[in-house]
From Swiss-Prot:
It is found in: Secreted. One of its GO terms (molecular function) is toxin activity. Pfam families: Endothelin (PF00322). Expressed by the venom gland. Residues 24-84, 112-118 form a propeptide. This is Sarafotoxin-i1. Belongs to the endothelin/sarafotoxin family. It comes from Atractaspis irregularis. InterPro entries: Endothelin_toxin_CS, Endothln-like_toxin.
Amino acid sequence: MALLPRLAAGGLLLLLALAALDGKPAPPKLLQKLMDGGQRRSEDQAAAGRIIDYEDGDEPVAVSVGDTKQAARALSPLRKPQPLCSCTDMSDLECMNFCHKDVIWINRNRKPSPIQSS
């Protein structure tokens, strides 16, 4: 159901509720939920929709789910990419054999190119 859009999921729940009633009067709680549009949520559901961030022993800061990308950018420091190899120079043959060949293997072109003869 996570793949369905919110509107489609709500419509599906409405259809299931109406099919379960089968002509009987709806209980008051079900009617209230249908009239609210499912906006009422329990404490656990409301807490699940937030990201809790603890910064340097401060009090937790709650961020809503819609702001997760902005919050992640604001809270995460810029990171330098880790170097793939730790070779000091190109004369270190052992490092070149074990490290740089892997880099070439990962970054190589996946499509074979035809050999052109002159």
